[in-house]
Amino acid sequence: MTIDLKTIKHISKLSRISVDDAKANKLAGDLNSIFDFIEKLNELNTDNIEPLTSVAETTLKLRADEVKSENIRDQILKNSPEENEDFFVVPRVVE
């Protein structure tokens, strides 16, 4: 895939970014280098390679989920400077 100035101008118009000709030439060269590298990666045979999900082979210890039926509403409301009918009362910020 080759990126030319016409494509750069089209992309810049779609993205609403102004690009002058000097920057467009440099950008076209940079994008062509990136696409050339991607093409080299596509040539690699990865059929017998297992997908890598993590560099380090680690597993996390999982804990068992426990359902707790504690009613901590009163403990939480104790931390509030002001409460009314089981709700926090906060100062008005918008008039």
Swiss-Prot record:
It catalyses: L-glutamyl-tRNA(Gln) + L-glutamine + ATP + H2O = L-glutaminyl-tRNA(Gln) + L-glutamate + ADP + phosphate + H(+); L-aspartyl-tRNA(Asn) + L-glutamine + ATP + H2O = L-asparaginyl-tRNA(Asn) + L-glutamate + ADP + phosphate + 2 H(+). Its EC number is 6.3.5.-. Pfam families: GatC. It comes from the Bacteria. Belongs to the GatC family. Heterotrimer of A, B and C subunits. HAMAP family: GatC (MF_00122). This is Aspartyl/glutamyl-tRNA(Asn/Gln) amidotransferase subunit C. The lineage of its organism: Bacteria, Pseudomonadati, Pseudomonadota, Alphaproteobacteria, Candidatus Pelagibacterales.
